[in-house]
A protein has these predicted regions:
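Basic, low-complexity intrinsically disordered segments
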Residues: 1-166
Length: 166
């Protein structure tokens, strides 16, 4: 799974979201840090969301094994983006609003496309390190890969075989 870093606007917290299965996953403790709330508050909101039927636990929760600092393995529950957003609406914190805004644009684009581009930053580096040339080189490398090339040839062949010769 990929890790996506989300930094809160106040800069006080950096949350590591686990990207897997077209969504992201967090524990209750990570949600508490994200929304600047207590773990008990997050747990209560999740309990109410499940009891009210707003969320189905089988669809939004999965078990995961993690290794703690002491070397022991522990079972933890992870909650997907649907659960994270639902809790964020109930917590009603400024951080919840910020995260929902970010998740509905940047995160959604990453989960769908596999990448996100900061168009404004790429157009105007303003003294920051400029990675535009690196990005172009990576795109050239992807476009030149054999697999992509042969896929395009197969697409052209399929298209040409659709034409009637008469």
């Amino acid at each position: 799974s990929d890790l996506i870093l989300y930094t809160t606007e106040d800069g006080r917290s950096q949350i590591k979201l686990r990207a897997q299965e077209q969504t992201v996953w967090l524990t209750q403790l990570e949600m508490a840090e994200l929304f600047d709330a207590t773990k008990q508050n997050i747990s209560l909101h999740l309990k109410n969301l499940f009891e009210d039927g707003e969320l189905d636990a089988d669809s939004v929760v999965k078990e995961s094994l993690t290794t703690a600092a002491d070397g022991k393995r522990y079972q933890t529950l992870l909650y997907n983006l649907d659960a994270i957003l639902a809790v964020g609406y109930r917590v009603r914190s400024p951080r919840g609003v910020q995260f929902r805004r970010w998740a509905s644009t940047i995160l959604k684009e990453y989960l769908v496309k596999g990448f996100v581009m900061d168009d404004v930053r790429l157009k105007n580096p303003d003294g920051r390190p400029d990675y535009f040339d690196e990005m172009l080189a990576r795109i050239r490398d992807i476009r030149a890969s054999e697999k992509r090339f042969y896929q395009k040839v197969r697409d052209l062949f399929a298209l040409s075989s659709d034409y009637d010769t008469t």
